[in-house]
């Protein structure tokens, strides 16, 4: 393979627009057989995923009852979609600079777009890393 062909194999990097959702958020893991609690479904953004191994819940931190512990508080960044299913490299383009900067993430995909949660202590570094590669932070929408 020539150098020119190797460059052709490089995934396309997208310049994306994103916004920070009002937060903070919590991520919790419950037993796989646990019922979905009412508190998990409240708010403008929540994600509930059940597998054979667990029930994962992402929801506003203020929704958690005292008996439920989440070790971190997270910010939630929403990529401005929608993105067609045929478009490749969208999430990679967004999380690669975060990975390069040592920022841990928790990603959620929906039908229209992607959401990336970042621990609050990494928020400033994360936004800076994203902007340095050309991603654009849009004004926050409160609703």
Each model region followed by its residue ranges:
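Regulatory modules associated with amino-acid/nitrogen control
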Residues: 1-97, 101, 125-143
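A generic structural motif
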Residues: 54-59, 113-119
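A cross-kingdom feature marking solvent-exposed beta-strand/loop segments within repeated
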Residues: 101-116, 122, 143
